[in-house]
């Protein structure tokens, strides 16, 4: 799914080790918001394993991005369901000045 919005906050960074593979991982959470009349907000994670995704995406607070998100439902040990929203790609969106016939600033 695509979501276009501004990163309004970077949340916590968590690290750990996969008990099965022994591979270290890192996760950074972000909050993004659309610029609509009634803004929509989403919290999502960027996971970093061997691919260096966190550094590659280099998301910055205050910048506008087109985010490519995966949604997955999981069940915890108590049997309750929850959603996991992860970004697998992001592209910075150019700012358009509509007063200049749609030319980029």
Protein language model features and the residues they cover:
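Single-stranded nucleic acid-binding surfaces, predominantly the OB-fold ssDNA-binding core
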Residues: 1-105
